[in-house]
């Protein structure tokens, strides 16, 4: 089933290993295009959900679809360990969302939880991630991590406040907007950093451990740190 590109029809849960395949639960359609999916698992509780995998091993990745018209695109050479993509929840489906993983990325331990419609997550090529917890609770929000970046242990990314904030005078929601978190090319995000609202980290920058980033920064080649984060030093770069 997983040796070549093809359409796999009518399953909600599929687990594959080198020696055997297990198919369970009710029957739904899903388009599953990949060459290397040993030890991968997919739960599909919707329709027209797609996975396009270009020669990356999905061992260590779980994908859960709760909703319709969602897609996962994984470029060549990316690997996963104990990582999960959640499109919605069992009683809270989401539609028209996308997760894109570029070439030669490494995602070790963590989850990306998309909790509302029309959200996008893009992780560009040669990015490494350790124990990421990303949640998209608001419609049309997005997370973009540019190429050659590194996220240390315990990073949290939430493009929203988590709950609606209401103005008591007119009962209108004051934080109802499209949040976009952006991490620039070749950035190093330290351990236990939190990025919220529409946080933006410029190219070639570092964010110090335990920092809270809640706004857009625009000076490249800089160090940002603190709660909330602020510019600490500029005219720097870093290497592994």
Identify the function of each model-found stretch.
Residues 71-200, 227-228, 235-236:
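Flexible, glycine/small-residue-enriched loop-and-beta-strand segment within the central core
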């Amino acid at each position: 089933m997983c040796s070549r590109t093809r359409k796999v029809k009518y399953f909600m849960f599929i687990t594959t290993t080198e020696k055997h395949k297990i198919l369970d639960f009710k029957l739904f359609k899903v388009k599953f295009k990949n060459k290397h999916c040993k030890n991968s698992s997919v739960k599909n509780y919707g329709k027209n959900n797609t996975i396009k995998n270009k020669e990356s091993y999905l061992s260590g990745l779980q994908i859960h679809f709760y909703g319709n018209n969602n897609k996962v695109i994984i470029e060549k050479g990316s690997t996963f360990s104990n990582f999960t993509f959640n499109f919605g929840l069992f009683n809270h489906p989401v539609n028209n969302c996308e997760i894109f993983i570029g070439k030669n990325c490494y995602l070790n331990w963590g989850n990306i939880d998309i909790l509302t419609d029309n959200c996008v997550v893009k992780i560009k090529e040669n990015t490494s991630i350790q124990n990421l917890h990303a949640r998209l609770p608001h419609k049309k929000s997005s997370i973009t991590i540019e190429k050659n970046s590194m996220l240390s242990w315990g990073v949290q990314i939430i493009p929203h406040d988590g709950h609606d904030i209401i103005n008591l005078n007119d009962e209108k929601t004051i934080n109802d907007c499209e949040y976009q978190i952006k991490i620039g090319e070749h950035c190093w995000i330290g351990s236990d950093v939190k990025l919220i609202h529409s946080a933006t980290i410029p190219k070639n920058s570092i964010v110090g451990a335990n920092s809270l980033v809640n706004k857009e920064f625009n000076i490249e080649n800089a160090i940002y740190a603190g709660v909330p984060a602020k510019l600490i030093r500029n005219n720097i770069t870093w290497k592994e």
